[in-house]
């Protein structure tokens, strides 16, 4: 086989693997060298969602049938000789480009992916002499944890975890200088059981290389289930005497109108400051012929420039032509498709019958490879299974365009662990989620654990937008249930949009209008236009039947969701709307959800990445909707801290749980959460809550579902009731601090969502209703537990108070009607896996019930009852440092207003 064929083979497997992580965890089970086929015979551990829990260990030796098929698919004849070696599967090694401008400082980015999963890996990267790698100029990102200087790798945070976790350090390194033979970077103790697209990303900053070729090498060792070493994988780069880093910068903007048409190209490069005279060349015939578009001199540019007025609908090529000096000659070529590419002109049918998935994925891949651009969907219906999104590609849906899910989405990923110990449930007695402290799959519900079984998926990509005023529908083919993996393989899609460790994601309609609000008479949203209203909502993106998640964004930053109408055409097959797990810098605004079965905006942090990640900086405004759960929720997944969350202008049409909920259960600190502070923009109305089982639900429990956690069964008495339940022994109780809620009008306090019901059924006494609940958490005392309490939590705190909680300017009218005996109700402490309103049973107050709170302000609040209620208006149970001012409760027919315990 020729060298070209070998390179093609490597590229083929690289593309298959990088483009679709879900399809295989073992890549390249064979290699061809000359006339010899090399087969790798070792062991790995790998589970699909169907693999029995004890059957994950498997051989890496490819079967003869599969080998023949792969050779056939690659167009390669079976080589003359065959050899089997006892090696780990080869790794993949990539650089961001093949050529670099010689003698000018540039960054070199290297990506490494081990051929198979393993704990406690050793990874070796060899850099030839001339590529100067140091602990200070090299930055490293291990499995997506975030980039840090190499020198700081041993100190990088491993996230939040319990002391039973095997790996409490991201890794260590050594850098051996072999003089003229280069340097070897040795990464030690790397946990590669998790696959987040790339295992290691290295960025070497400001490197100057000479005009020559350099060969980089990488290899690694496995520890389990069998100690193995891989062969060396090589990649070659070259220093050249020409500009090699001309780059077209992708469009990045957060406003998108119907008239948007990208016709400007922006470029950057590293220029030689001594020889500035350069021309920018343009080609309209795929780089066959060139003409000058700009003459540049030193005063006209600083390593960047724009080209404007390009004709839409054309593919342009650009390059630099340096006229003098050591870099004289033409640079690398960059591409730009001006305007938007009409997908129907490139083989996509959009006829509602033909499966357009493969052609659309090819267009997305091609557009990304050419630097990005916008795909335009004209009127039509486009059936798709899974669209694999790529960096810098935008989708524009015209008003008559419908993207429609069909069966056959990508399967869930292969994983090192089995998830069968826990996929869903709320049991306080089930120890299986904690059985293996390292198994990150069992620390959250199955819907959060897998990412590729989605209608749209992206992993470690950036600058992706799905915009317009068309429609996206799951069409009944996206599953809502927790038992999704019991379905046939082609029916396991449970997410519409799934983004994992991405940056700069936007989904929504056309922007430019003002604030969205709601008209009770028409039961429709409208836009505010100054002091008037605008009932034209045709700018909104329409989404329906989104499955378990319309959006699951995990470890994804700079997210913008806006101007979307959920459920206009169909209201079934929808559960959560927006789930943000461990995301930062998120904006959500102008959202209307006609009805759904779960949270509309939900924030959390889980273990699905194999590590935890903090969540911070949220701006949420103008959210209107009806839900079977909560309109706004923090939790239940709270494996890491969540802070700086600003919510303004919410309108709850119905909620069978809470209008506004904060629930920390897994040890995280939730802090600095504000409702109606005005931080996100204008407070155009008071917030409204109607038909909520409870308006507010703030709670703490110690479920402790985080990697490294340990749980034991205990028997104890509480309120004269025997409880036999799990208690978490090594995870601190979470915190809720600095919460300010104000400016809300609340009425019809009962679970009155129209989910699977009339719109809306009036209160008849059968619906569930609760007080505003604000409750910390206390472990049972030593004397309450049979045999005593056998552990002390890491911070020695066994009662966690909510701290600095403020309610101001709240007007509430409740149903009332409770008898005198309910005033003596003693709600239980929340057990493991219990975090819902109903778990507190009946409360002794009809207005606010506070327990385990330190630092409380209730000011300018009023509570009224439709019927006399024999409970207290406000109960303070184990509350410290409270300030109550200007409160109003009903008169003589009700009991005493306030009770202190």
Question: Across the structure, where does each feature detected by a protein language model lie?
Answer:
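Extracellular/periplasmic carbohydrate-active domains that bind, remodel
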Residues: 16-17, 25, 81-901
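Bacterial N-terminal signal peptides
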Residues: 10-19
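N-terminal targeting signals for Sec/Tat export/insertion, comprising classic cleavable signal peptides
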Residues: 33-68, 77-79, 99-116, 204
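Bacterial N-terminal signal peptides that target proteins for export
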Residues: 1-9
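Cleaved targeting-peptide boundary
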Residues: 25-31
């Amino acid at each position: 086989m020729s060298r070209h064929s070998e390179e093609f083979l490597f590229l083929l497997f690289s593309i298959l693997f990088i483009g679709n992580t879900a399809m295989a965890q073992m890549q390249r089970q064979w290699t061809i060298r000359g006339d010899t086929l090399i087969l790798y015979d070792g062991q790995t551990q790998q589970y699909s969602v169907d693999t029995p829990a004890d059957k994950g260990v498997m051989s890496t030796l490819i079967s003869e049938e599969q080998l023949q098929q792969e050779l056939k698919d690659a167009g390669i004849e079976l080589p003359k000789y065959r050899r089997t070696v006892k090696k780990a599967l080869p790794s993949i090694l990539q650089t961001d480009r093949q050529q670099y401008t010689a003698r000018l400082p540039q960054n070199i980015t290297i990506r490494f992916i081990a051929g198979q999963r393993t704990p406690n890996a050793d990874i070796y990267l060899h850099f030839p002499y001339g590529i100067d790698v140091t602990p200070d100029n090299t930055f490293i990102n291990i499995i997506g944890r975030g980039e840090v200087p190499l020198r700081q790798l041993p100190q990088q945070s491993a996230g939040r975890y319990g002391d039973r976790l095997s790996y409490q350090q991201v890794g260590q390194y050594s850098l051996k200088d072999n003089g003229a033979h280069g340097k070897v970077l040795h990464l030690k103790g790397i946990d590669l059981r998790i696959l987040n697209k790339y295992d290691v990303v290295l960025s070497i900053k400001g490197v100057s290389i000479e005009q020559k070729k350099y060969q980089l090498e990488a290899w690694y060792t496995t520890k389990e289930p069998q100690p193995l070493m891989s062969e060396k994988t090589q990649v070659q780069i070259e220093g050249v005497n020409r500009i090699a880093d001309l780059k077209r910068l992708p469009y990045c903007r957060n406003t998108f109108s119907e008239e948007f048409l990208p016709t400007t190209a922006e470029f950057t490069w590293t220029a030689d400051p001594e020889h500035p005279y350069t021309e920018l060349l343009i080609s309209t015939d795929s780089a066959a012929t060139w003409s000058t578009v700009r003459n540049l001199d030193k005063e006209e540019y600083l390593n960047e420039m724009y080209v404007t007025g390009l004709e839409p609908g054309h593919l342009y090529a650009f390059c630099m032509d340096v006229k003098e000096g050591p870099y004289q000659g033409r640079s690398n070529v960059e591409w730009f498709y001006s305007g938007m590419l009409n997908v129907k002109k490139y083989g996509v049918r959009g006829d509602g019958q033909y499966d357009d998935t493969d052609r659309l994925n090819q267009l997305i891949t091609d557009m990304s490879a050419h630097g990005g651009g916008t795909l335009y969907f004209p009127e039509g219906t486009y059936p798709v299974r899974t669209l694999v999104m790529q960096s810098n590609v935008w989708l524009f849906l015209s008003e008559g365009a419908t993207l429609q899910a069909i069966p056959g989405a990508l399967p869930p990923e292969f994983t090192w662990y089995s998830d069968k110990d826990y996929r869903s449930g709320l049991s306080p007695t089930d120890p299986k989620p904690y059985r293996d402290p390292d198994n990150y799959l069992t620390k959250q519900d199955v819907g959060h654990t897998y990412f590729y079984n989605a209608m749209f998926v992206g992993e470690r990509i950036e600058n992706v937008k799905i915009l317009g005023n068309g429609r996206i529908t799951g069409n009944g083919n996206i599953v809502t249930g927790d038992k999704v993996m019991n379905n046939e393989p082609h029916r396991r899609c449970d997410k519409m949009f799934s983004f994992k460790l991405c940056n700069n994601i936007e989904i929504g309609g056309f922007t430019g209008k003002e604030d969205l609000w709601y008209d009770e008479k028409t039961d429709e949203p409208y836009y505010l236009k100054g002091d008037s209203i605008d009932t034209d909502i045709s700018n909104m993106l329409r989404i329906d039947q989104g499955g378990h998640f319309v959006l699951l964004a995990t470890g994804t930053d700079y997210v913008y969701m806006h101007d979307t109408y959920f459920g206009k055409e169909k209201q079934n097959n929808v559960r959560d709307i927006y789930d943000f797990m461990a995301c930062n810098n998120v904006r959500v605004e102008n959202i209307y959800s006609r009805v759904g079965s779960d949270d509309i905006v939900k924030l959390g942090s889980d273990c699905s990445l194999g590590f935890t990640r903090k969540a911070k900086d949220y701006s949420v405004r103008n959210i209107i909707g009806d839900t079977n759960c909560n309109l706004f929720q923090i939790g239940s997944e709270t494996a890491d801290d969540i802070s700086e969350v600003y919510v303004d202008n919410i309108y709850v049409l119905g909620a069978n749980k809470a209008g506004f909920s904060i629930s920390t259960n897994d040890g995280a600190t939730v802090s600095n959460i504000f409702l109606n502070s005005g931080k996100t923009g204008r407070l155009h109305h008071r917030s409204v809550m109607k038909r909520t089982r409870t308006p507010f639900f703030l709670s703490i429990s110690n479920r402790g579902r985080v990697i490294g956690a340990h749980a034991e069964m205990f028997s104890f008495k509480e309120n004269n009731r025997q409880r036999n339940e799990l208690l978490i022994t090594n995870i601190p109780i979470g915190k809720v601090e600095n919460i300010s809620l104000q400016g809300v009008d609340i009425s019809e306090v009962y679970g009155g969502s129209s989910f699977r019901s009339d719109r809306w059924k009036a209160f008849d006494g059968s619906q569930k209703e609760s007080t505003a609940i604000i409750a910390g958490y206390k472990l049972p005392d030593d004397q309450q537990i049979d045999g005593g309490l056998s552990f002390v939590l890491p911070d020695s705190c066994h009662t966690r108070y909510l701290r600095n909680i403020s309610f101001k300017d709240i007007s509430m009218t409740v149903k009332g009607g409770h008898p005198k005996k309910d005033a003596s109700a003693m709600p239980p402490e929340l057990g493991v896996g219990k975090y819902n309103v109903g778990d507190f049973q009946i409360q002794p107050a009809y207005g606010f019930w506070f327990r385990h709170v330190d630092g409380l302000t209730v000011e300018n609040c009023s509570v009224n009852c439709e019927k006399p209620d024999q409970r207290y208006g406000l109960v303070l149970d184990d509350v410290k440092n409270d300030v109550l001012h200007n409160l109003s409760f009903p008169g003589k027919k009700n009991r005493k207003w306030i009770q202190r315990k």
